[in-house]
């Protein structure tokens, strides 16, 4: 059994101003665990800041979790002997993401997020997956028995790559989108019965692909929530919450009225369990992303990359303030990473949604495709919870997504960008003629070529 007071957590992306701060926060609040957090990042300055912030926090008398944060300049050194590995990286910079998201707009293609599917998600994967190939090899060589926790998008393809490269890896992907839908169901209960229900008390069965997940069951203390949800949907044809002011549309980057979820429920009889911004990118483009008027009518927003750049400036300021001595303020992150780590160490059990290879938990999707369902965490064990069959109409969408993701994974790892173009031109949001699709694809690759290891080979093929 592992020494829970002498653990090693390796963090790939340890200079993060987001996910890393969440982990620093949650480890500080947990009294049972201690050890070293090994920070590795190509952004060495960011990693060194997190090193000092984490150690300053651990030194405080009011902090329960005592950890030593240490920067490593080489990934092999960071991973050596690790019990857990956390991965949260930005593949490239926001300049590359700006191309992913906004270059397609010249062709009338709108993407609220652009990191999981669609033209942006596909090109992002071509940059990201070779990095994950390297991570998988490094994990195999330095800590093959470690549990690996991924937060990076495109989530499904990142996890799939880890298993393709190192089949024995013990990896899973975490996403908090389902939590938001549990909170929505809690609101439905509040509005309907004046009940105050923690989202954790709503028991759900989850099926799908990350960012395109659905609930096929939802219960609270044995009460079936589907009839209640159906009535609520019927009573709120325009969604819920305040309509987004068109004059301040760009200042509400994550808002939605859940109208897309409600519409998908009418189509499929299942409760969509991700943010509307993510859901729409997996659907045929004319449904929700036809044009700006359609987008506004469904009550969600497009998250501009300029907003992300501005947000990063703010995050860097907060980090710098903490680095210079301003006390780190603990908060409720809503994340379950530390609970998962504790369960894997044998300190209790937990059931929650994760992204792992399909071993039959979704009966009618391909074996080994990475799917999102519930899983049972216990001592050094992660077992998927059987989720059953997906109804044919919804499964048709899932099967297309799986096929696209498998194609893109193969293309990224072999450097066959022509194969990636096949997935690109087949994507339901790329509603373009062949020549326009080719021109868009080539322009997007050109804009991010610095991070594409096989770009020169692709150019030779074109010529």
Feature-to-residue mapping (PLM):
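Rossmann-fold NAD(P)-binding glycine/threonine-rich loop
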Residues: 95-165
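Conserved NAD(P)H cofactor-binding loop of Rossmann-fold oxidoreductase domains
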Residues: 89-92
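Glycine-rich phosphate-binding loop and adjoining beta1-alpha1-beta2 segment
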Residues: 29-64
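Internal, well-ordered domain-core segments that constitute the primary functional module
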Residues: 135-223
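Redox-cofactor binding/interface segments in oxidoreductases and associated redox assembly factors
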Residues: 80, 86-87, 150
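Short acidic low-complexity segments
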Residues: 68-81
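Long, compositionally biased stretches enriched for glycine and/or charged residues
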Residues: 193-463
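N-terminal Rossmann-like dinucleotide-binding module
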Residues: 7-37
């Amino acid at each position: 059994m592992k020494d829970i007071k002498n653990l090693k957590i390796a963090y790939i992306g340890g200079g993060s101003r987001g996910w890393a701060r969440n982990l620093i926060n949650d480890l500080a609040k947990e009294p049972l665990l201690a050890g070293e957090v090994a920070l590795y990042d190509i952004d060495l300055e960011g990693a060194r800041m997190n090193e000092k912030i984490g150690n300053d926090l651990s030194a405080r008398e009011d902090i329960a979790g005592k950890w030593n944060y240490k920067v490593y300049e080489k990934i092999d050194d960071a991973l050596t002997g690790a019990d857990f590995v956390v991965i949260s990286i930005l593949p490239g910079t926001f300049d590359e993401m700006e191309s992913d998201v906004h270059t397609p707009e010249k062709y009338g293609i709108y993407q609220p997020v652009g990191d999981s599917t669609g033209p942006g998600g596909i090109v992002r994967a071509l940059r990201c997956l070779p990095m994950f190939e390297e991570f998988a090899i490094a994990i195999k060589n330095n800590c093959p028995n470690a549990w690996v926790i991924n937060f990076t998008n495109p989530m499904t393809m990142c996890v799939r790559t880890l298993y393709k490269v190192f089949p024995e890896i013990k990896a899973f992907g975490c996403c908090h989108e389902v939590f938001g839908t549990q909170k929505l169901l809690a609101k439905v209960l509040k509005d309907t019965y004046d009940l105050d229900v923690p989202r954790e008390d709503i028991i759900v069965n989850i099926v799908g692909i990350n960012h395109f997940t659905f609930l096929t069951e939802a219960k609270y203390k044995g009460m079936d929530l589907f009839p209640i949800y159906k009535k609520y949907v019927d009573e709120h044809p325009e969604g819920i919450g305040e309509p987004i002011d068109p004059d301040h549309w760009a200042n509400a980057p994550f808002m939605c009225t859940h109208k897309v979820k409600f519409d998908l429920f009418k189509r499929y009889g299942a409760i969509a369990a991700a943010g509307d911004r993510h859901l729409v990118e997996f659907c045929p483009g004319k449904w929700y992303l036809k044009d700006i008027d359609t987008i506004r009518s469904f009550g969600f927003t497009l998250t501009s990359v300029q907003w992300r750049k501005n947000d990063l400036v703010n995050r860097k300021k907060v980090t710098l303030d903490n680095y210079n001595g301003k006390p780190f303020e603990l908060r409720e992150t809503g994340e379950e990473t530390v609970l998962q780590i504790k369960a894997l160490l044998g300190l209790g059990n937990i059931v929650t949604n994760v992204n792992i290879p399909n071993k039959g938990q979704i009966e009618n999707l391909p074996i080994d495709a990475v799917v999102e369902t519930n899983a049972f965490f216990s001592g050094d064990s992660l077992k998927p919870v059987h989720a059953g069959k997906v109804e044919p109409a919804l499964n048709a969408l899932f099967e297309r997504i799986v096929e696209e993701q498998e194609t893109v994974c193969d293309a990224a790892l072999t450097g066959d960008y022509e194969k990636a173009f096949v997935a690109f031109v087949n994507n339901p949001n790329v509603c373009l003629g062949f020549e326009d699709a080719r021109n868009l694809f080539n322009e997007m690759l050109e804009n991010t070529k610095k991070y594409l290891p096989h770009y020169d080979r692709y150019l030779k093929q074109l010529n």
